[in-house]
Amino acid sequence: MAGLAGAQAVAPAPELGESIVFIKNDRLLPEDLETTIFRPEGPGPFPVVVINHGKDTGNNHLQPRARYLPAAREFLQRGYAVVVPMRQGFSKSGGAVVGDGCNIGGSGEAQADEIHSVVAWIEKQPWADTRRMAMLGQSHGGLTTLAYAQKPHPGFKLFVNFAGGLRFTTNCQWELALKDAFARYGAQTRVPSLWFYGENDSYFPPSVIGPAYQAYVKAGGQAEMVAFGPFGVDAHGMFSSYDGLAIWWQKVEDKLKEVNLPTAVVHPQFARAKRMAAPPPSGFAPVQDVDKIPHLGKAGRDGYRVFLGKPGTRAFAIAPGGAWGWAHGGDDPLKRALDNCNRIGKGSCRLYAVDDQTVWSVDAK
């Protein structure tokens, strides 16, 4: 029986005030940018947080719509509207990715052009208080955030970079290119930023990001580094995980207070809903061992390899008939993985792996 190739598209959640809009960018041939909006009830105006997404490997039109629910829920509780734009060439946004290549500084600036278009749209929204804004970015989105901070809208009071950068593995001295990009940005930036990088970041370990950070500061940039040590099997996914909140939220909240942005919880209904509990680790097989998974054919094993590349909270489910499905991030990836699998498995699916542990046992049916 054929399985489901990964996670299904997630519909907007009305209980989070979530909607999807398409915003034109400002290029010679404009493209529509798929943009997720989370808003509290009421007319506003609300302070605004913009979150810039990372870059998956492969075809970026297949990249899921970014939501970053751990962060979105924290800001919603405090009365913010949250805007998460997919840049050109990503997910359902039109066109091809711009600024790709070893010119990492130019790549970040090309991505920042997309964000300038989104901010211009935000300025026209009656629900947005553009005097009180913050911007966060993860991975490629962190690079985008630092590039944007060179010429920001004056309403942005805080910029936060989570594991920001861009990495290439062939035909590129990307470590030097990243250092040069950060030096360039630091020389042109007059607003402070807060940076989070983990010890076991598979993309940007301390040996890479340390010199890049020093280049940024030496060039004149004002940045505070939070080196938070190891996180799970890969610190690069920290921001996407609810477990990561313990590392970054308090520090960001302190910075919000310093710049007179709101931090009091005014909408507690946006707190995270209870999620399905994970089964205990079974030790059935190492989670990375694709060949040990029972029941799956080639498509399912290929899907499992994709699953293994996803950071943060994740789950993979299988069924005796060959059905499979996975999910990562969001409020309840365990339940979503089972739901995805059971669209074909008809109730026979069981969890095989959760996060970095195998939970399947030989007694599972």
Would you name each region that the model predicts?
Residues 158, 164-220, 224:
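The feature captures the conserved acid-bearing segment of alpha/beta-hydrolase catalytic domains
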Residues 56-67, 74, 84-110, 237:
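Cap/lid segment of the alpha/beta-hydrolase catalytic domain
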Residues 90, 243, 265-365:
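Secreted/extracellular ectodomain signature
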Residues 219-278:
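C-terminal catalytic histidine-bearing segment of alpha/beta-hydrolase fold enzymes
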Residues 45-54:
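Short beta-strand element of the alpha/beta-hydrolase
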Residues 103-125:
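Alpha/beta-hydrolase active-site loop
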Residues 9-43:
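N-terminal cap/lid segment of alpha/beta-hydrolase-fold proteins
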